[in-house]
């Protein structure tokens, strides 16, 4: 009987402790949602190493490889490749690192994500061109979408959408997607968010048949396209709560557009929120999402994103 042959490496004690800590984190173990990340927590660096294949000594090399790949592809003269090179030209290495992290330090896949990022903007210019900062602010103040001021226990940014009071005549679907895109772009400047990702909570309490009938398949596809391969973001979970029976019709329109990876991260809870609260702590959720905090106030988040109202100018992106 021959001895089994294998390889192993000794895991440093500090690394073992950090991995153990990752299993017991609370919402208080993470940095702020808004603004830059001054210093990544040690357990988040360990998470980046374990989940994203990130090593401090290979970051610069990966960025350089992506820069070279962008130029090499642009040399082919292909239209999208040229658009990617133009988009990247004025951006720093921190911008490229977002894409590398989102694709676990696979430079080839990071480039494909860059192409998706640029193509989404070319495909849907109405979400990006000549936007009014004042209009964006008003949409975000109305809570479309919302953002929790605390990360969840996994360090993810939690985005909220409460459909009950939404009237498409007052706030259009495109205006909501414009706000989503603006928020994603802003919050992805934070390295902790790049590593830990996002979680989306959709509250469908009060969702009417009239609202369901007004949702066009083209709009729903645009929303799904935003979530898939168009941002250097890790969308880790999408939770639907309090949905009525006819929500199934809307969801069945969306499902064919979802890739299997994202589909597996969709959770439909109905009115039984026990499983939902195991993932998202009640003490960080507003009352209108079943939590213990006061009702969501979009003006607080808008001030974090835009500053005090007196300092805001009506300018274009």
From Swiss-Prot:
Q: Specify one Pfam family.
A: CRAL_TRIO
InterPro entries xref list: CRAL-TRIO_dom, CRAL-TRIO_dom_sf, CRAL/TRIO_N_dom, CRAL/TRIO_N_dom_sf
Keyword terms of this UniProt record: Acetylation, Cytoplasm, Retinol-binding, Sensory transduction, Transport, Vision
Summarize subunit and interaction data from the UniProt record for this chain: Interacts with DEGS1; the interaction increases synthesis of chromophore-precursors by DEGS1.
Molecular function GO terms recorded: 11-cis retinal binding; retinol binding
- The superkingdom listed in its UniProt entry is Eukaryota
Chain's role: Soluble retinoid carrier essential the proper function of both rod and cone photoreceptors. Participates in the regeneration of active 11-cis-retinol and 11-cis-retinaldehyde, from the inactive 11-trans products of the rhodopsin photocycle and in the de novo synthesis of these retinoids from 11-trans metabolic precursors. The cycling of retinoids between photoreceptor and adjacent pigment epithelium cells is known as the 'visual cycle'.
Record's protein name: Retinaldehyde-binding protein 1
What is this protein's tissue specificity according to the annotation?
Retina and pineal gland. Expressed in Mueller cells (at protein level).
């Amino acid at each position: 009987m021959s001895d089994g042959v294998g390889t192993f490496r000794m895991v440093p004690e500090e690394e073992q402790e950090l991995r153990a800590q990752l299993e017991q984190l609370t919402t208080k173990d993470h940095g702020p949602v808004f603004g830059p990340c001054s210093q990544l927590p040690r357990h988040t660096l360990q998470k980046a190493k374990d989940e994203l294949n990130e090593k401090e000594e290979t970051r610069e090399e990966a960025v350089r490889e992506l820069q070279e790949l962008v130029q090499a592809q642009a040399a082919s003269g292909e239209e999208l490749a040229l658009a990617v090179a133009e988009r990247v030209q004025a951006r720093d290495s921190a911008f490229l690192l977002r894409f590398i992290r989102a694709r676990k330090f696979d430079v080839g896949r990071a480039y494909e994500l860059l192409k998706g990022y640029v193509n989404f903007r070319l495909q849907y210019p109405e979400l990006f061109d000549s936007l009014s900062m004042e209009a964006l602010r008003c949409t975000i103040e109305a809570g479309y979408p919302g953002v929790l001021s605390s990360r969840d226990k996994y360090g993810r940014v939690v985005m909220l959408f409460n459909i009950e009071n939404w009237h498409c005549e007052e706030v259009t679907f495109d205006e909501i997607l414009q706000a989503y895109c603006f928020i994603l772009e802003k919050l992805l400047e934070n390295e902790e968010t790049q590593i830990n990702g996002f979680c989306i909570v959709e509250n469908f309490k009060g969702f009417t048949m009239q609202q369901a009938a007004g949702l066009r398949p083209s709009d729903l596809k645009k929303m799904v396209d935003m979530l898939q391969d168009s941002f250097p973001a890790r969308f880790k979970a999408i939770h639907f709560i309090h949905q009525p029976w006819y929500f199934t019709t809307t969801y069945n329109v969306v499902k064919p557009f979802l890739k299997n990876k994202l589909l597996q991260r969709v959770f439909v809870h109905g009115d039984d929120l026990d499983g939902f609260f195991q993932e998202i702590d009640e003490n960080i959720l507003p009352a209108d999402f079943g939590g213990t905090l006061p009702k969501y106030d979009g003006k607080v988040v808008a001030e974090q994103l835009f500053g005090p109202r007196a300092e805001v100018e009506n300018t274009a992106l």
